[in-house]
Amino acid sequence: MKRTVIMMLDSFGVGAAGDAAKFGDLGSDTFGHIAKACAEGKADIGREGPLTLPNLARLGLAHAAMESTGAFAPGFADDVELIGAYGHAQELSSGKDTPSGHWEMAGVPVLFDWGYFSEHQNSFPKELTDKILARAGLDGFLGNCHASGTTILEELGEEHMRSGKPIFYTSADSVFQIACHEGTFGLENLYRLCEIAREELEPYNIGRVIARPFDGTGPNDFARTGNRKDYSLEPPAKTVLDKLKAAGGEVVSVGKIADIYAYCGITKKVKANGLEALFDATLAEVKSAGENTIVFTNFVDFDSHYGHRRDVAGYAKGLEYFDSRLPEMLSLLDEDDLLILTADHGCDPTWQGTDHTREYVPVLAYGAGLKAGSLGRRNSFADIGQSIASYFKLEPMEYGESFI
């Protein structure tokens, strides 16, 4: 039976990419810097000691990172019995954002330039916001700036609740984010507002509109809820997900995968929030998956909870939890199944600012007759999509080189 499981550790980079300097990210290293902080006793909040990832290490994580950076991360060495094939991949796409990374790993790199709102204050054109407000029947909005999603709630959450004005903000990514309180503004109202924004943003070539619902009573307890929703553009070409679906296969989205691909190529969507629930849902879908199925999960917490918030200890704890559950996944796989663990970009929690970092991503592959050992440096994330196409005997993708 042929099945593929893709476990996408959102933002888990393994060292500055070859073109990192163009992005201001030379020297970034999500995995390496987390390991270093743990080894130095600087990540002992909620956990303690060196970063411990025995199962990821057996799959080749430390070796992939060593080939990327030239040295083993602190606490890791060439002393494990490898069971997986490992490599590290350079992003071909023009950006270091979520859609670019995901689309490229499915065989469709983003070779055009996204639109961005580059001004840190007064970020959005008045013509754009006027149209959104008019269509939504609103008399104003808050924000209009680059911001951390948690900080802006502390600063503007109460005013939003009093005034009913939505919070519009952006970042270094090609994104338009809208934060609204679920109780006072309403979740469905937020979703409708995002749909309007998605339509009005078409001329600006913005990759995503993101609904950022939150709850709480004040700055001390405002918190995002699990009802985030991404409104992405469609990929510019057919991904390997589309091709498997067209061939009669199944593509199961766990978490925000369906949103990122604008539902293209998806046959089933499973909602789950948090590392534990996402892992549980992935296991459940693998248990029930039949022939010619992809189960594709985005573990978003690594990015949203730990990377952007620059929470080194939280990131380390999350990785150790993820690692502790990998044996459950491995025990479910048949000999012919293919397991791939990778990332869509970096988000080094020790780096300046709060944005993504341009890094190599790990490519860890297990099963399907693959021999344990190095896959080397891959020239594109699209090698993953090409390998999946080869595995399922689909029409080859335009980009990427198969390692199967």
Curated annotation (Swiss-Prot):
SUPFAM superfamilies given in the database record: Alkaline phosphatase-like, DeoB insert domain-like
Lineage: Bacteria, Pseudomonadati, Pseudomonadota, Gammaproteobacteria, Alteromonadales
Co-factor note (free text): Binds 2 manganese ions.
Enzyme Commission identifier(s): 5.4.2.7
Its job: Isomerase that catalyzes the conversion of deoxy-ribose 1-phosphate (dRib-1-P) and ribose 1-phosphate (Rib-1-P) to deoxy-ribose 5-phosphate (dRib-5-P) and ribose 5-phosphate (Rib-5-P), respectively.
Localization, UniProt: Cytoplasm
Highest taxon, organism lineage: Bacteria
GO molecular function, one term: phosphopentomutase activity
Protein's UniProt name: Phosphopentomutase
Cofactor: Mn(2+)
Keyword annotations of the record: Cytoplasm, Isomerase, Manganese, Metal-binding
Gene Ontology terms: cellular component: cytosol
Binding site for Mn(2+) 2: 303, 308, 356
Associated pathway: Carbohydrate degradation; 2-deoxy-D-ribose 1-phosphate degradation; D-glyceraldehyde 3-phosphate and acetaldehyde from 2-deoxy-alpha-D-ribose 1-phosphate: step 1/2
Broad class of the protein's primary localization: cytoplasm
Gene3D superfamilies in the record: Alkaline Phosphatase, subunit A, Phosphopentomutase
A Pfam short name: Metalloenzyme
Annotated Mn(2+) 1 binding sites: 10, 344-345
BP terms from Gene Ontology: 2-deoxyribose 1-phosphate catabolic process; 5-phosphoribose 1-diphosphate biosynthetic process; metabolic compound salvage; nucleotide metabolic process
Annotated family: Belongs to the phosphopentomutase family.
Reaction(s) catalysed by this chain's protein: 2-deoxy-alpha-D-ribose 1-phosphate = 2-deoxy-D-ribose 5-phosphate; alpha-D-ribose 1-phosphate = D-ribose 5-phosphate
